[in-house]
């Protein structure tokens, strides 16, 4: 399974969605731009996408109210360690109220992995961040047992968020 992501204005991206009604494409709006997320086993309909292979997934990409993309740049040497960490993750987020889906995305044309989580609402995501399962999932962060203390990261990670577009 592949995920393709492209960015632009909501009006322009909406025309792409309308041209391809049978494709599984999400249109979402962020603070600075809009995003299309296309999940498919085939080729993408985008002209210039960021391409990813799905290496872990739970739930369906449908019509969430809120999306969180954790962008994590990983060195070539660090990829096996990073992927192993996510393949052995606690899996707690799936049981949270308002959770809809997660995709761990391996980049095909860059060094930046994306951890995509989809939620019913922004408040559901914020509630998860205050929960025990969030603390459990991140308990090894900044410890010798975690991977944050190694040099597998190319640069600091960053998070982008998006809201559903009707």
UniProtKB/Swiss-Prot annotation:
Where do the annotations place heme binding? Answer: 138
Residues in ABM domain copies = 66-153
- Catalysed conversion reaction: heme b + 3 reduced [NADPH--hemoprotein reductase] + 3 O2 = biliverdin IXalpha + CO + Fe(2+) + 3 oxidized [NADPH--hemoprotein reductase] + 3 H2O + H(+)
Q: Which GO terms describe its molecular function?
A: heme oxygenase (decyclizing) activity; metal ion binding
Task: List residue numbers at the site (Transition state stabilizer).
Answer: 128
GO process annotations (BP): heme catabolic process
Q: Which InterPro entries match?
A: ABM_dom, Dimeric_a/b-barrel, Heme-degrading_MO
Q: Which SUPFAM superfamilies match?
A: Dimeric alpha+beta barrel
Q: Which domain of life is it from?
A: Bacteria
The protein's Enzyme Commission number: 1.14.14.18
Supply the induction statement.
Constitutively expressed.
Broad EC category: oxidoreductase
Q: What happens when the gene is disrupted?
A: Neither hmoB single mutant nor the hmoA hmoB double mutant display robust and reproducible phenotypes relative to the wild-type.
The protein's location, in the record's own words, is: Cytoplasm
Name the residues that bind Fe cation. Answer: 33
Tell me which GO cellular component terms the UniProt record holds: cytoplasm
Q: Which UniProt keywords apply?
A: Cytoplasm, Heme, Iron, Metal-binding, Monooxygenase, Oxidoreductase
Q: How does it assemble?
A: Homodimer.
Function as written in the Swiss-Prot or TrEMBL entry: Catalyzes the oxidative degradation of the heme macrocyclic porphyrin ring in the presence of a suitable electron donor such as ascorbate or NADPH--cytochrome P450 reductase, with subsequent release of free iron.
Family assignment from sequence similarity: Belongs to the antibiotic biosynthesis monooxygenase family.
Name recorded for this polypeptide: Heme-degrading monooxygenase HmoB
Q: Which organism is it from?
A: Bacillus subtilis (strain 168)
Q: What is the lineage of its organism?
A: Bacteria, Bacillati, Bacillota, Bacilli, Bacillales
């Amino acid at each position: 399974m592949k995920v393709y992501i492209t960015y632009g204005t909501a009006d322009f991206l909406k025309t792409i969605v309308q041209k391809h009604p049978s494709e599984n494409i999400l249109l979402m709006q962020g603070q600075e731009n809009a995003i299309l997320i296309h999940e498919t086993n085939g080729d993408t309909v985008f002209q210039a996408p960021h391409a990813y292979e799905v290496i872990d997934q739970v739930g369906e990409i449908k019509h969430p109210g809120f999306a969180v993309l954790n962008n994590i740049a990983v060195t070539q040497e660090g990829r096996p360690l990073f992927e192993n960490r996510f393949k052995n993750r606690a899996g707690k987020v799936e049981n949270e109220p308002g959770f809809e889906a997660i995709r761990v995305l391996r980049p095909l044309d860059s060094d930046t992995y994306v951890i995509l989580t989809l939620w019913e609402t922004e408040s559901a995501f914020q509630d998860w961040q205050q929960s025990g399962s969030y603390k459990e999932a991140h308990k090894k962060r900044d410890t010798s047992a975690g991977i944050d203390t190694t040099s597998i990261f190319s640069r600091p990670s960053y998070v982008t968020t998006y809201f559903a577009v009707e």
